[in-house]
């Protein structure tokens, strides 16, 4: 009787293995639709650079698109680019439902801009109109304020943006120009040391969906910002940590945890980018509560973050600092003599027991999207003005320009930009970015040097 039972269980096990094998063979034969394969192929490079896999793989596993073994195979690859390539190699072999499940997983993991890219490409291939995205209001391609009261936003009529000068389809495929050996040799001695691999850790914290009593609007275009920054920072040689939709308390806790990571000891710099609604001196969590920016800086100062002492720390704040829209002024005839004033810093170190003391806060540079009291502008398809300008300048000039000078160039780009939304208060609106610095040396990022 026992022997019979054992044979029965063994038979069931063999049948199970045969069924699994048969399912795999069916998937291989009945593969992905050719249009879906072509869509993935046309966007392969963008997907390989921009996909964020940690959560995405779990969704694909839950949908039976990949197996546990496949997930382990992907995760075993070194680096995010190689992992993304491995997933893209597997997807076309995972059956006719794989493409739709992949798009759904992108949407569920807040990578809707990549889903939009795929669906737009697919519609071009099939010669049909692209479906509307539910991730953002695609009827508002012009600039909107980062944190405008509801009564102001209600005036943004969909009848006014057909000829929007701000139209765009999302972040471009980024490339960062590498630093030459000659430039490095000529500048490294007068600059901060930036040789570690990776250059440092970067944290991108993006709040898009808001709850609570503040009635803060969905940050349409915010997904474009964080994806663009993640790509830029990776190309500049940073290990990037990404956090989405955090409450004010969660933001404070995650920033503190990030500041205390042991990896800061063996890297040469650090980046923190905060993308959300805001007011002067504070940035909103998704619960409508404020995190004070001074608290953010305190977490990374010399007293609280000794691992980053004497190392450059970069902060980028994409948020309003008030609710005033900059209407701009008419420029007078004649040459423009406007210049940005310089800012001198003094050394105040004293020796004690032959050990140099440090000021509590130093070696920081912070870029703000707008001036105090003003609103920051954001394009619902291309992302915020500031992040777009920042990405453009850093990708083109990090190879031969230090960070402070690049932020001056960002200011120049923002100064020239003008909103286009006829019939609304945002028509011909302006924005002016700024930065503040306690850097003590020139900060060159030296992208791509030394070659790996």
Curated annotation (Swiss-Prot):
Belongs to the peptidase C14A family. This is Caspase-2. The CARD domain mediates a direct interaction with CRADD. GO terms for molecular function: cysteine-type endopeptidase activity; identical protein binding; protein domain specific binding. Its EC number is 3.4.22.55. The gene is Casp2. Heterotetramer that consists of two anti-parallel arranged heterodimers, each one formed by a p18 subunit and a p12 subunit. Forms a complex named the PIDDosome with PIDD1 and CRADD. Interacts with NOL3 (via CARD domain); inhibits CASP2 activity in a phosphorylation-dependent manner. It holds the Pfam family CARD. Disulfide bonds: none annotated. The modification N-acetylalanine is found at residue 2. The modification Phosphoserine is found at residues 157, 340. It catalyses: Strict requirement for an Asp residue at P1, with 316-Asp being essential for proteolytic activity and has a preferred cleavage sequence of Val-Asp-Val-Ala-Asp-|-. CDD domains: CARD_CASP2 (cd08332), CASc (cd00032). Residues 327-336 have a biased composition (Basic and acidic residues). Residues 2-169, 326-333 form a propeptide. Residues 327-349 are annotated as: Disordered. GO terms for biological process: apoptotic process; apoptotic signaling pathway; cellular response to mechanical stimulus; DNA damage response, signal transduction by p53 class mediator; ectopic germ cell programmed cell death; extrinsic apoptotic signaling pathway in absence of ligand; intrinsic apoptotic signaling pathway in response to DNA damage; luteolysis. Residues 32-121 form the CARD domain. PROSITE patterns: CARD (PS50209), CASPASE_CYS (PS01122), CASPASE_HIS (PS01121), CASPASE_P10 (PS50207), CASPASE_P20 (PS50208). The keyword Protease applies. The mature protease can process its own propeptide, but not that of other caspases. Involved in the activation cascade of caspases responsible for apoptosis execution. Might function by either activating some proteins required for cell death or inactivating proteins necessary for cell survival. Associates with PIDD1 and CRADD to form the PIDDosome, a complex that activates CASP2 and triggers apoptosis in response to genotoxic stress. Coiled coil: none annotated. GO terms for cellular component: cytoplasm; endopeptidase complex; nucleus. Keywords: Acetylation, Apoptosis, Hydrolase, Phosphoprotein, Protease, Thiol protease, Zymogen. It comes from Rattus norvegicus.
């Amino acid at each position: 009787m026992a022997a019979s039972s054992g044979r029965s269980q063994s038979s069931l096990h063999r049948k199970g293995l045969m069924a699994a094998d048969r399912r795999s063979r069916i998937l291989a034969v009945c593969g992905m639709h050719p249009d879906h394969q072509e869509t993935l192929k046309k966007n392969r490079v963008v997907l390989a650079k921009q996909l964020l896999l940690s959560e995405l793989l779990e969704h694909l596993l839950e949908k039976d698109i990949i197996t546990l073994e496949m997930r382990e195979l992907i995760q075993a690859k070194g680096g995010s680019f190689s992992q993304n390539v491995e997933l893209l190699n597997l997807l076309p072999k995972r059956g006719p439902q794989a493409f739709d499940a992949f798009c759904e997983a992108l949407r569920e993991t807040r990578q809707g801009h990549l889903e939009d890219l795929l669906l737009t490409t697919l519609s071009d291939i099939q010669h049909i109109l692209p479906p509307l995205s539910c991730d953002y209001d695609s009827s508002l391609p012009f600039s909107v304020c980062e944190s405008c009261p509801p009564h102001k936003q209600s005036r943004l009529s969909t009848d006014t943006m057909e000829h929007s000068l701000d139209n765009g389809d999302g972040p471009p495929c980024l490339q960062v120009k590498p630093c030459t050996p000659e430039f490095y040799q000529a500048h490294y001695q007068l600059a901060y040391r930036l040789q570690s691999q990776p250059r440092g850790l970067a944290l991108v914290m993006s709040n898009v969906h808001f709850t609570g009593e503040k009635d803060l609007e969905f940050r349409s275009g915010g997904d474009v910002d964080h994806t663009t920054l993640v790509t830029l920072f990776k190309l500049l040689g940073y290990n990037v940590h990404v956090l989405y939709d955090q409450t004010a308390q969660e933001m404070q806790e995650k920033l503190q945890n990030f500041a205390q990571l042991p990896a800061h000891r063996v890297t040469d710099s650090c980046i923190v980018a905060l993308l959300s609604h805001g007011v002067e001196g504070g940035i909103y969590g998704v619960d409508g509560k404020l995190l004070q920016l001074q608290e953010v800086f305190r977490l990374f100062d010399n007293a609280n973050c000794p691992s980053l002492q004497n190392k450059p720390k970069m902060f980028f704040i994409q948020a309003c600092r008030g609710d005033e829209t900059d209407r701009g002024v008419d420029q007078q005839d004649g040459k423009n003599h406007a210049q940005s004033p310089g800012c001198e810093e003094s050394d105040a170190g004293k020796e004690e027991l032959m050990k140099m003391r440090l000021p509590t806060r130093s070696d920081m540079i912070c870029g703000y999207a707008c001036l105090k009291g003003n609103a920051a502008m954001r394009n619902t398809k291309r992302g915020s003005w500031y992040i777009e300008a920042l990405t453009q300048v850093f990708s083109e000039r990090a190879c031969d320009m230090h960070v402070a000078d690049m932020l001056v160039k960002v200011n120049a780009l923002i100064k020239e930009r003008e909103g286009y939304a006829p019939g609304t208060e945002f028509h011909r609106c302006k924005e002016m970015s700024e930065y503040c610095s306690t850097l003590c040396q020139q900060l060159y990022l030296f992208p791509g040097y030394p070659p790996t």
